[in-house]
């Protein structure tokens, strides 16, 4: 009677021992946890570099690189793969029973003790290439493979676990530093966001593209159109209830568009689209500031509906009318100013033209307000008082005075506009005589591309300028002097007859 026996018992002892070694032998593939640990440790060391990196990319696992690394690890060669192409590579070997991923990455990172970042050099007789590859900022993909080698070519010991990691894009470019020093994430590429001091790719790259500034167009129904200024002499006006504005295009009627622009641009002629059109861009202010432009500019725009004064137009000699006919303009100012500032926009090329038109070549019947060109821009906190350049003839109204502006690069806060003689403030556009009543205007700032930035503050009151008060007294003396000379003999004759 034969008893049953296991087939394992029938095997020769040497073969059975070999099968047991194969069954219980060390594993050669990295587990999912080991792969994640590999990526996490790389990113941890990359985020903690010293000095900090401004362009360090976040590293992620790549299966193709892992397969390439595994294929080379199976060759059991202690040396870099000469056929790796455009791939970086780090190697690690251990004679213990299993692979230790934290120990491998930690050994690579310890090489930073021998690396001089300022000179991008390694200490003599030391290795730094593993560390520089770990922290190479442009590298963002890693794939690793391990293999158990009974014999490792180039090493005397037996039974070694070999770890091979490949990187893309490769690091260790000769003559270059591993990363750019600076504030973390301050130089991330387009399409990347900041995560734990590393530049992480955005999930939706389309959102990373620079979108143009949002422009909100004002509907045509909100604009009040008027006939062309060339045909009727009255410029077209349009207002918007937007809080901020930056682009104003005028072609027979003004319309405002809202966008976060910061500069004021004006071409030399200030007329680019049609006979009566002009294109300007004004800065969006933090506080709502009504704008009043002097020459070819849009009227003031406020948060709510704005009421404008009736245009002031005083006839002038033919030479001035011909010059003014080239550009339609009118005097516009708010009836009641709620803000102490307004904007005076000037073009660098048109400033001499404004000054040339403002200089009186012939005596006029009305006094003129002169806007002199600043000879030199003063420093911040330096304000230069300038005398008026034009001599005004006799004023028909005792309230008419000459202008004495202040020149500065910064905005000069002043008192709000004052009303005198029951008349409202009026700002001249293109060199026409000013209105009989000239009140104190707030400060005005100018910002033009290709020109100069000026802050002008006009002082109109005679009490603030003693010279102007003396000018009024002298004029009154000149007027009454001849009459007193004629009346005195008559009075003496009458006294003798009596």
Swiss-Prot record:
Record flagged with keyword Amino-acid biosynthesis: no
GO terms of molecular function: peptidase inhibitor activity
Chain positions covered by the region annotation Disordered: 204-277, 317-407, 419-467
Pfam family, one: CAP
Highest taxon of the lineage: Eukaryota
GO biological process, one term: negative regulation of cell growth involved in cardiac muscle cell development
Entry's localization field: Secreted
Family indicated by similarity: Belongs to the CRISP family.
Subunit structure: Interacts with PSP94/MSMB.
Protein purpose: May inhibit cardiomyocyte growth.
Protein known as: Peptidase inhibitor 16
Provenance organism: Mus musculus (Mouse)
